[in-house]
C-alpha cells in the first residue's frame, strides 16, 4: 500500500500507462485478396478485393447487368471514388437476401470494410464518409391489432 495516492499533485505527476490504440494492419489471404462482409436491411454481401483493372462482379455477373439502375451502381462505386481508388481494384462479391437497394448497400458496406483491410490508411477517409458504419435501419415489425406496423384499421364512428 506504499503507492497509494494521497494528493492531487501525486495524481497529476503520474505518467499515463503505455496503452496505444490498436494499429490496423493489412489483412490479405494467400491469394492477395482482402475479404469483408457487409450488411444492409436483410441483405448480406461477402466481398473480396484485389489489385486489378476495376472490374466488379456481383453473383458472377457484371455490375451493370446485376444492378440495372444507375443509382445502385453509383452507390457501389462511392467508397472507391471517395478513397480515389476507382479502377484500381477488382471486386468479386456474392450477395443474398433483401431487395436490390439493400443488396447495393450491403455491397458498399462490405467493399468499404475490405478496402480498409487492404489499405488501413484509408480508414479515416471512409469513416468520415460514413461508409464503414452499419446502417441499422430495418423494417419495423407489424403489431397485432393494427393493419401494418403503425397503420390502424379503418375506424367507423357509426
UniProtKB/Swiss-Prot annotation:
Protein name: Small ribosomal subunit protein uS9
Swiss-Prot/TrEMBL keywords: Ribonucleoprotein, Ribosomal protein
NCBIfam families, alphabetized: PRK00132.1
Family: Belongs to the universal ribosomal protein uS9 family.
GO-annotated molecular function: RNA binding; structural constituent of ribosome
Statement: the UniProt record of this protein carries the keyword Ribonucleoprotein: yes
Lineage: Bacteria, Pseudomonadati, Pseudomonadota, Alphaproteobacteria, Hyphomicrobiales
One GO location term (cellular component): cytosolic small ribosomal subunit
InterPro entries associated with the record: Ribosomal_Su5_D2-typ_SF, Ribosomal_uS9, Ribosomal_uS9_bac/plastid, Ribosomal_uS9_CS, Ribsml_uS5_D2-typ_fold_subgr
Gene Ontology annotations of biological process type: translation
Amino acid at each position: 500500500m506504499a503507492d497509494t495516492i494521497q494528493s492531487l499533485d501525486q495524481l497529476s505527476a503520474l505518467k499515463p500507462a503505455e496503452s496505444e490504440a490498436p494499429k490496423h494492419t493489412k489483412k490479405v489471404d494467400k491469394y492477395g485478396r482482402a475479404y469483408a462482409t457487409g450488411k444492409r436491411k436483410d441483405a448480406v454481401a461477402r466481398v473480396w478485393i484485389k489489385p486489378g483493372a476495376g472490374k466488379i462482379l456481383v453473383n458472377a455477373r457484371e455490375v451493370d447487368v446485376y444492378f440495372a439502375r444507375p443509382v445502385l451502381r453509383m452507390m457501389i462505386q462511392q467508397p472507391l471514388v471517395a478513397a480515389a481508388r476507382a479502377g484500381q481494384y477488382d471486386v468479386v462479391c456474392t450477395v443474398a437476401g433483401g431487395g436490390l437497394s439493400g443488396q447495393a448497400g450491403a455491397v458498399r458496406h462490405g467493399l468499404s470494410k475490405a478496402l480498409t483491410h487492404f489499405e488501413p490508411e484509408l480508414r479515416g477517409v471512409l469513416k468520415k464518409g460514413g461508409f464503414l458504419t452499419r446502417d441499422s435501419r430495418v423494417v419495423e415489425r407489424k403489431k397485432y391489432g393494427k393493419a401494418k406496423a403503425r397503420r390502424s384499421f379503418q375506424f367507423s364512428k357509426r
